Amino acid sequence: MRLITHNMLSCNIKGVTSGFPLRIEAGNVIEKEVDFNPDFIRHMFAKIEWKALVEGARSMGYAELPEESPDAAVLKSDEPFLKKLHHALLELHLEEGALVCPETGRKFPVNKGIPNMLLHEDEV
């Protein structure tokens, strides 16, 4: 599971009001090279919840992103930053581990890079 995916997932258990961001418990993290496309990264930046991305990246062992979200000027001119963001969003893969609901503590397993977000009958 890539961090770009993680940034769009939330806990949908009935009654949960603060199910985002899911905390990552990383078991196995791998890196898979992906072609760098700066225009795609710039486009996706507006859709990303920055704090969740930084926390997710750090939980997967990647600490190259700044705490504070950069401004638009950085996105236009700072290619090294865009490459770091690209790496975090697209090249880091959580192969094994879990996503944990911040409100309930419910763990959603991640196996072979696929998060299992299915709810139990009593959670629907």
UniProtKB/Swiss-Prot annotation:
SUPFAM superfamilies for this protein: Trm112p-like (SSF158997)
Biological-process GO terms, alphabetical: organ growth; regulation of cell cycle; regulation of cell population proliferation
Any one Gene Ontology molecular-function term assigned to this protein's record: protein heterodimerization activity
InterPro entries linked: Trm112, Trm112-like
Membrane-spanning residues: none
UniProt xrefs under Gene3D superfamilies: 2.20.25.10
Domain TRM112: 2-120
Disulfide bonds: none
Phenotype caused by lack of the gene: Semi-dwarf phenotype. Reduced organ growth due to inhibition of cell proliferation.
Task performed by this protein: Acts as an activator of both rRNA/tRNA and protein methyltransferases. Required for TRM9 tRNA methyltransferase activity. Involved in the regulation of cell division progression during organ growth. Required for the expression of cell cycle-related genes, and the G2-M phase progression during organogenesis.
Assigned protein family: Belongs to the TRM112 family.
Subunit-level organization: Interacts with TRM9.
Name the UniProt record assigns to this protein: Multifunctional methyltransferase subunit TRM112 homolog A
Organism (species): Arabidopsis thaliana (Mouse-ear cress)
Gene from which this protein is expressed: TRM112A
